[in-house]
Amino acid sequence: MDIVQILSIIVPATLVYAAPLILTALGGVFSERSGVVNIGLEGLMIIGAFTSVLFNLFFGQELGAAAPWLSLLAAMAAGALFSLIHAAAAISFRADQTVSGVAINMLALGATLFIVKLIYGKAQTDKIPEPFYKTKIPGLGDIPVLGKIFFSDVYYTSILAIALAFISWFILFKTPFGLRIRSVGEHPMAADTMGINVYKMRYIGVMISGLFGGLGGGVYASTIALDFTHSTISGQGFIALAALVFGKWHPIGALGAALFFGFAQSLSIIGSLLPLFKDIPNVYMLMAPYILTILALTGFIGRADAPKANGVPYIKGKR
């Protein structure tokens, strides 16, 4: 097996598992850059996965190929609305942001399973009729070598996730809006003095995290899980949180970290096809992403400094 064949197996599989992590981690970047810790990324992914699956089941046959894309829009809307609970608790009521995020995770899982049981009489939905399918990107898939590796067996959602990472970088670091988001996460009092509404910007940051988290959950459900159960997301939001920290709260850093974790997750699927990993028991491959997550969060891979006001409630006029 030559290097091109190996990469043509590794890269598409990595992109499949990395895409939901990229999207969810980007949401965390916006929230935490605005000064609100978001442990609730797992819950936002659960809401997104649940919404996209139900939308696809209810409307998939009528909408056809448009159903998975529209289900992602529904997932984004649901994630944004659900994130308002965390925003209100953390920003308006100045609750402990870590506790609020954990509550979001618990509420999301409990509420979605309750609704699924009401509808289906069991804790699992049917398989969605219109998932996303791997495809060859027109034109790009015909490029020698690179086309076979990157563009011949890929989901459009993977390309979308990578594109959104660069768009997020541009918004955060090259636009006035991004400057305002970052200012309320670093020096909210100075931002307030300059006329920036700290509460408004933090609400926007958390809602953007809801949009991205819902999108990440929807992508995972529409490309990998294809149904919804209590274990559909199963820690993906926490891995995305690790990618956020590992990426040092930067969109491109989060992209790189998510690709790394995506590769680790893909090994359990493609490991037996690769000469280097084929003799390693699959159980170790399943453990790999979680071990790497722990290493990243404990600072083994490098020190990461959060925005200075991250997790600190802002009280107008208090010094």
Swiss-Prot record:
Location, primary (coarse class): membrane
CDD domains the record matches: TM_PBP1_transp_TpRbsC_like
Domain of life: Bacteria
One GO location term (cellular component): plasma membrane
Annotated keywords: Cell membrane, Membrane, Transmembrane, Transmembrane helix, Transport
Subcellular location as annotated: Cell membrane
Induction: Transcriptionally regulated by CodY.
Pfam families per record: BPD_transp_2
Positions of transmembrane segments: 6-26, 39-59, 65-85, 99-119, 159-179, 204-224, 235-255, 257-277, 282-302
Keyword Transport: yes
GO molecular function list: transmembrane transporter activity
Function: Part of an ABC transporter complex involved in the uptake of guanosine. Responsible for the translocation of the substrate across the membrane. May be a nucleoside transporter of broad specificity but with various affinities for different substrates.
Subunit structure and binding partners: The complex is composed of two ATP-binding proteins (NupO), two transmembrane proteins (NupP and NupQ) and a solute-binding protein (NupN).
Name by which UniProt lists this protein: Guanosine ABC transporter permease protein NupQ
Organism name: Bacillus subtilis (strain 168)
Recorded name of the encoding gene: nupQ
